[in-house]
Amino acid sequence: MREYLPDTKFVHSSNGHDLRLWDDQRRNSFVDLIKDSTVFINASKIYQLGQLQLLNLAYETAIEHNIQNYTVINIGSTAEFDPTQFEMYSIEKNALKERSRQLASKGFRSSHITIGNLDHVKGIGKTIKLVLEHDPFLSMVKIEH
């Protein structure tokens, strides 16, 4: 990922960030991260619609603080296409995809990326870079390797 996005700040539990928005302290911490950035790559696997909650709070924060051209890149899953096998995980990823589509239709820079059969994480970084640099903005990307 760093090869394609060298200025990326990674936020995860092992470096002190808890993105489960279960209390005001965590929500406020996330809001501060959004206010101090221009792009949020929404890739955390948090059950109970955690990615959807992160997308909604990023959107609300960008609107409330008038952050122009804020971008959210949502990382989907091929589980979106197999609800029989992946059940709730498929439902959560499809909810994320649909909400991203709704926000994009309002003019908010939200993109949903689904990459199948990926052997190397670097493919995700390359795809995110493509979305960020593409004009017009790509609100939905599906790639099969």
Report residues per predicted region:
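C-terminal helical subdomain
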Residues: 118-145
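Canonical Rossmann dinucleotide-binding motif of NAD(H)/NADP(H)-dependent dehydrogenases/reductases
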Residues: 1-11
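Conserved NAD(P)H cofactor-binding loop of Rossmann-fold oxidoreductase domains
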Residues: 39-50, 76-79
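Rossmann-fold cofactor-recognition segment
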Residues: 10-28, 40-41, 45-46
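Conserved amphipathic alpha-helix within the SDR
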Residues: 24-35, 57
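Structural motif
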Residues: 38-39, 71
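Amphipathic alpha-helical dimer-interface segment in Rossmann-like NAD(P)H-dependent oxidoreductases
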Residues: 32, 45-70, 105
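Catalytic loop of short-chain dehydrogenase/reductase
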Residues: 63-64, 69-106, 114-122
